[in-house]
């Protein structure tokens, strides 16, 4: 006992040292600002404000939480400030969906609305022709300007959006997932039986927040699963998701046959008590669908899907996640945990895309959605996978139809199988396309996909690729807050304001590094050219001269 206590104290000390020395997130030319609520005036929504050299500023959606506020001290093991605790204490124990159906706007809903607008309502664009030309094609989506708390309430009530916020995760900053809002990006972290400590997982979490992860899934499969999850939850300002099946399997030492509903149920309750915001539940992998995967090139590639398929065959019984689904709903309702209905039969190769097994499970997901809604539980649906570009639209169309417009959450999809080491690029192409079609949450893919456990650089590259995909989709959809950053960066580029170009970029450090490889001196940051064209062939420089000439003759 003494040895275990000493070890725990040592881990707490290491985490405290890490948080003190490394856990401050900084962005160039930026400061943390807070926007006040109107319905709930005590609400303070954290945003990032970039200051530009010409006096302009840009307010951005910020996933970094208290880590980017130098005025907040983060202590371990207590973790982050318990932002939502006062709201939770003074109201009935209901889900966000239940409140929404009753017509009640919660503080979480107003908080999410303020984040979505990014102070866009304060900026007016007078070029009406440009606005009409670039207004975007939201397809069947309806995106108001501005986005109001009432609109968010209605979207949740209709099942078209979720606000994942377990009552036992008060540290989380409310956010909304749905096709009528900014496209969100999920990052996966977690240890394996071979790697990682508690401190390393917290470091991964903060690193993912730094690069814009809107949600994080803890997919730990090794030892200390519960301890790692507890520490992540206490230090996370974004919703945390898990696959409870992984911990349940650890409890039986990986013996699939020994897994029971009772073991899974207890695991579910334990994780809900800790504060997990959404669970991936592979309840759509049914006995009758398993033979449909026999002719596939890559079989069943979902870890949870393959485990439940094996369990069904070993026991010659139906999937207990399906047969006990209403009991799962009751547990999740008690804590306001959201469903992320797993796509256990998703295609793992282009050859298997859009096959019978995949869409059979999707139909069952739709049936389960309706049961979850009946119990007042929020739900989103997970999707593929490996899909060629020409088949992506069918996935989105069928999901909207089968699942009654519940949020879609996809892994990519990867648009080709030939890019090991570059799967983050191949999948970001598919992610941008399906997000424009209506996908609400994109699970990032890193360069290590199919090859190994990603390191910090892989996490960064995966998130950057997916933030680009999400933003491209927001532009295409015509989200009212999407284009501000593009316009300001383009103006800075045309006016040779190099520092503003760097600071407005998704990755300012890399942009500055690439520029400085050939023109490192400070004087080059004011030059009217870069090393690509030089001073004589810069099109922007020439364009300025053309404008000056036109002004003189007119």
Swiss-Prot record:
Enzyme Commission number: 4.1.99.17
Cofactor note as given: Binds 1 [4Fe-4S] cluster per subunit. The cluster is coordinated with 3 cysteines and an exchangeable S-adenosyl-L-methionine.
Pfam families: ThiC-associated (PF13667), ThiC_Rad_SAM (PF01964)
GO cellular component: cytosol
Binding positions (substrate): 188, 217, 246, 282, 302-304, 343-346, 382, 409
Record-listed [4Fe-4S] cluster binding positions: 530, 533, 538
Top-level taxon of the source organism: Bacteria
Entry-linked InterPro entries: ThiC, ThiC-associated_dom, ThiC/Bza_core_dom, ThiC/BzaA/B
Keywords on record: 4Fe-4S, Iron, Iron-sulfur, Lyase, Metal-binding, S-adenosyl-L-methionine, Thiamine biosynthesis, Zinc
Cofactor list: [4Fe-4S] cluster
Bilayer-crossing regions: none
Entry keyword annotation includes Ribosomal protein: no
Molecular function terms, GO-annotated: 4 iron, 4 sulfur cluster binding; carbon-carbon lyase activity; zinc ion binding
Gene Ontology BP term (one): thiamine diphosphate biosynthetic process
Reaction(s) the record says it catalyses: 5-amino-1-(5-phospho-beta-D-ribosyl)imidazole + S-adenosyl-L-methionine = 4-amino-2-methyl-5-(phosphooxymethyl)pyrimidine + CO + 5'-deoxyadenosine + formate + L-methionine + 3 H(+)
Assembly information from the UniProt record: Homodimer.
Known role: Catalyzes the synthesis of the hydroxymethylpyrimidine phosphate (HMP-P) moiety of thiamine from aminoimidazole ribotide (AIR) in a radical S-adenosyl-L-methionine (SAM)-dependent reaction.
HAMAP family xrefs: ThiC
Entry similarity comment: Belongs to the ThiC family.
Name of this protein: Phosphomethylpyrimidine synthase
Provenance organism: Coxiella burnetii (strain CbuK_Q154) (Coxiella burnetii (strain Q154))
Gene expressing this chain: thiC
């Amino acid at each position: 006992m003494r040895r275990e206590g000493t070890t725990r104290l040592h881990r707490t000390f290491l985490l405290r040292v890490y948080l003190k020395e490394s856990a401050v997130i900084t962005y160039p030319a930026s400061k943390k600002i807070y926007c006040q609520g109107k319905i709930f005036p005590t609400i303070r929504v954290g945003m990032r404000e970039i200051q530009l050299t010409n006096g302009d500023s840009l307010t951005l959606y910020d996933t970094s939480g208290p880590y980017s506020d130098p005025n907040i001290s983060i202590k371990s093991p207590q973790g982050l400030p318990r932002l939502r605790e006062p709201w939770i204490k003074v109201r009935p124990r209901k889900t966000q969906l239940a409140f929404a159906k009753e017509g009640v706007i919660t503080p979480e809903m107003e908080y999410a609305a303020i984040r979505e607008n990014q102070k866009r309502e304060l900026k007016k664009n007078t070029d009406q022709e440009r606005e009409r030309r670039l207004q975007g094609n939201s397809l069947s989506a309806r995106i108001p300007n501005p986005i109001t708390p009432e609109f968010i309430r209605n979207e949740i009530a209709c099942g078209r959006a979720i606000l994942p916020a377990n009552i036992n995760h008060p540290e989380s900053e409310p956010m909304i997932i749905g096709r009528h809002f900014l496209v969100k990006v999920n990052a996966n972290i977690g240890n394996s039986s071979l790697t990682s400590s508690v401190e390393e997982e917290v470091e991964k979490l903060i690193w993912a927040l730094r690069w814009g992860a809107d949600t994080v899934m803890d997919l730990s499969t090794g030892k200390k699963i519960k301890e790692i999850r507890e520490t992540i939850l206490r230090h996370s300002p974004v919703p945390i998701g898990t696959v409870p099946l992984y911990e349940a399997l650890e409890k039986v030492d990986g013996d699939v046959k020994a897994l029971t509903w009772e073991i899974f149920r207890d695991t579910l309750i334990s994780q809900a008590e800790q504060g997990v915001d959404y669970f991936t539940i592979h309840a759509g992998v049914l006995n009758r669908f398993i033979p449909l995967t026999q002719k596939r090139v890559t079989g069943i590639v979902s870890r949870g899907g393959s485990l439940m398929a094996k369990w069904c065959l070993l026991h010659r019984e139906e999937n207990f996640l399906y047969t006990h689904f209403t009991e799962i709903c009751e547990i999740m309702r008690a804590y306001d945990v959201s469903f992320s209905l797993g796509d256990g039969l998703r295609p793992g190769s282009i050859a298997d895309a859009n096959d019978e097994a995949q869409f059979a499970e999707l139909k069952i997901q739709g049936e389960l959605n309706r049961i979850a809604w009946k119990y007042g539980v929020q739900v989103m649906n997970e999707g593929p996978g490996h899909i060629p570009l020409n088949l992506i639209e069918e996935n989105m169309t069928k999901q909207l139809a089968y699942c009654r417009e519940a949020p879609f959450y996809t892994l990519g999809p990867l648009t080709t199988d030939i890019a090991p080491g570059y799967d983050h690029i191949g999948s970001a192409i598919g992610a941008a396309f399906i997000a424009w079609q209506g996908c609400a949450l994109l699970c990032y893919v890193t360069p290590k996909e199919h090859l190994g456990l990603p390191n910090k650089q892989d996490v960064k590259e995966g998130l950057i690729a997916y933030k680009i995909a999400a933003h491209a989709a927001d532009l295409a959809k015509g989200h009212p807050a999407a284009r501000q950053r593009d316009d300001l960066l383009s103006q800075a580029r045309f006016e040779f304001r190099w520092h503003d170009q760097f600071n407005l970029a998704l990755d300012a450090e890399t942009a500055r590094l690439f520029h400085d490889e050939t023109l490192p001196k400070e004087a080059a940051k004011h030059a009217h050219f870069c090393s690509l064209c030089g001073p004589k062939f810069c099109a922007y420089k020439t364009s300025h001269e053309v404008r000056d000439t036109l002004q003189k003759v007119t």
